[in-house]
Amino acid sequence: IPKVVEYKKASSFFEGDEEYEENIIPNIIPIWDHSPRSRGKSLVLNHAEPSYFARHMKEAIKRIENKPLDHRLAFVKSWNEWAEGNYLEPDLHYGKRYLEVIKKNVVEG
């Protein structure tokens, strides 16, 4: 049986003050469902939505914005890990909304 955690609740644990340090790179997680690969001992982030991803992204940007330019990095996990329910590619449920969050917060800033 997978462990199911609400994304909104879990996302507070994604961020830490250490991410303000110059050599620490934040990781932004859009969606997570490891149950197809884990057979029982898995984690599912329930109700992962673009609006929560946007909030998580804004927090990561806040943590890197005052770092030297060559340390202003954040990782987004992951482009197309469909087997782990961890992806940004457009889908039938949210369309391009995850990509639009990135465009709004990073490209248009």
List PLM regions with ranges:
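Generic structural signal for well-ordered alpha-helices
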Residues: 8-11, 57-61, 99, 103
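A structural motif corresponding to the C-terminal end of an alpha-helix
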Residues: 13-23, 63-70, 105-109
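Aromatic-lined glycan-binding groove of carbohydrate-active enzymes
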Residues: 1-51
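Aromatic-rich peripheral "rim/lid" segments of glycoside hydrolase catalytic domains that contact
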Residues: 85-109
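Extended aliphatic helical segments
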Residues: 4-5, 44, 76, 81, ...
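Substrate-binding cleft of secreted/luminal carbohydrate-active enzymes
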Residues: 49-93
